[in-house]
Design a protein with these regions (language model features):
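Non-catalytic terminal accessory segments
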Residues: 1-144
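Soluble catalytic domains of enzymes that build or remodel membrane lipids, polysaccharides, and related
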Residues: 149-150, 157-392
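Short amphipathic alpha-helical coupling elements at transmembrane boundaries
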Residues: 28, 65-72, 153, 168, ...
């Protein structure tokens, strides 16, 4: 724990230092002025993560909720500014290393050096402007709410009973200070218009104290489907006392699957809906650590024609494929949530957005129906996924 705290503190100090350095050049500030801007900025962006856990009652206060939303907007602006700054600084370093191999009096050396000087000083305002544009457009995208994406999903094990079976997937809603009644009702209304056979919520439904946001959680009771509404916990549910979160979900009409499954009978076909716990449970709820064999246990010894596994994080794909899962539904990655962070996600996750196939298993990773942290969805809109099973 001490090691993790040390690493976190070191990274935070490096980010503060780098931000101060970039603000000096971008806005022609003194070092002291830059520090005076950076410290309150970091508190607004990240302070709520600590304050809400130290004193959860703060989330009830409207002014604090507005402050959290402001921090979310600033986080998106800062994140975009920093990532573009890091990229441009990296390119400049590569160029500087390259021109050192040229004669210092050569025309090429002088022209490149002059361009680098102008870009670092006279044109340093470009990155903040780009960051502001991306932040504004990304914020407007979050206000619009999730889009509907329809996917025709083909698989060799889809028979005539399963043909045209409609699965609506909601993921990473992150109910909390910035996602409340209006946004949740928008999600519910758009979901119900899709005439779902089942609805699945693949984790990170709640990202705040469930006692304070009980009203918002209860709204999920309005989700209705012919064969039920199923959900699993993501990693964020564990940050708010998992048992309290699960109890609040069980007060709705959602069926919570914790290493469990349910079998739906469609004429002569048995469809299994299974849900596995998140890897976070290994440390925070070890009695309910992920157990794929237990999750897919067929206690009734029925012939299962099609197996659907709900797993918040998609990195379980290899084990799921080996054990015979037909369709893996996941979330967690947010697809990067907004440009340019979507370009970094493939470095961590093999399957991070949309439809894919691993051997014989189909995978769909929902990029998030809500958002986390920055109120920014530039280039990666929030999504409600409609998967229509289609016979080959």
């Amino acid at each position: 724990m001490r090691k993790q705290f040390f690493i976190f503190t070191l990274i935070l100090l490096l980010l503060i230092t780098y931000t101060c350095y970039k603000l000096v050049f971008a806005f022609n500030l003194s070092k002291l002025e830059s520090l005076a801007v950076t410290l309150p900025l970091f508190f607004l962006m990240f302070g709520n993560f600590f304050v809400s856990r130290i004193n959860p009652l703060m989330d009830e206060k409207k002014w604090y909720q507005y402050l959290t939303i402001l921090g979310s907007l600033l986080m998106g602006l800062w994140g975009t500014f920093i990532i573009f700054s890091i990229i441009t600084d990296f390119v400049k370093i590569i160029i500087l290393i390259g021109i050192n191999f040229l004669p210092s009096q050569s025309v090429v050396y002088i022209e490149i050096s002059d361009w680098l000087f102008k870009f670092s000083n006279q044109y340093s305002f470009i990155i903040p402007i780009v960051a502001i544009i991306i932040t504004v457009l990304g914020f407007l995208e979050t206000i619009r709410g999730p889009v509907i994406k329809k996917i025709a999903l083909k698989h060799k094990n889809i028979n005539s009973d399963l043909h045209d079976f409609r699965i609506v997937q909601i993921s990473d809603l992150h109910i909390g200070p910035s996602i409340q009644n209006e946004y949740i009702n928008k999600v519910i209304q758009r979901t119900q218009q899709l005439d779902p056979d089942i609805i699945v919520l693949t984790g990170d439904i709640i990202d705040a104290n469930p006692k304070i946001f009980a009203e918002q959680i209860q709204l999920l009771s309005h989700l209705k489907a012919k064969h039920g509404v199923y959900c699993i916990a993501g990693n964020h549910e564990y940050y708010w006392e998992i048992n309290t979160v699960l109890n609040s979900l069980k007060k709705t009409n959602l069926t919570v699957l914790m290493n469990q499954n349910n079998i739906i009978k469609l004429n002569n076909t048995n469809l299994m809906i299974a849900g596995i716990t998140d890897p976070t449970s290994k440390k925070m709820d070890p009695l309910n650590s992920p157990d794929l064999n237990k999750t897919l246990l067929n206690a009734q010894n029925l012939i299962i024609d099609f197996k659907i596994l709900l797993a918040h994080q998609p990195n379980i794909y290899s084990e799921a494929s080996q054990i015979g899962v037909d369709l893996l539904l996941s979330g967690h990655t947010h697809g990067g949530q907004f440009f340019p962070f979507n370009l970094l996600v493939p470095l961590v996750h093999k399957y991070y957005r949309g439809l894919a196939k691993h051997h014989e298993m189909a995978i769909y990773v929902n990029p998030g129906t809500g958002y986390w942290g920055p109120m920014n969805r530039f280039g990666i809109p929030a999504e409600i996924s409609l998967l229509v099973l289609t016979q080959d």
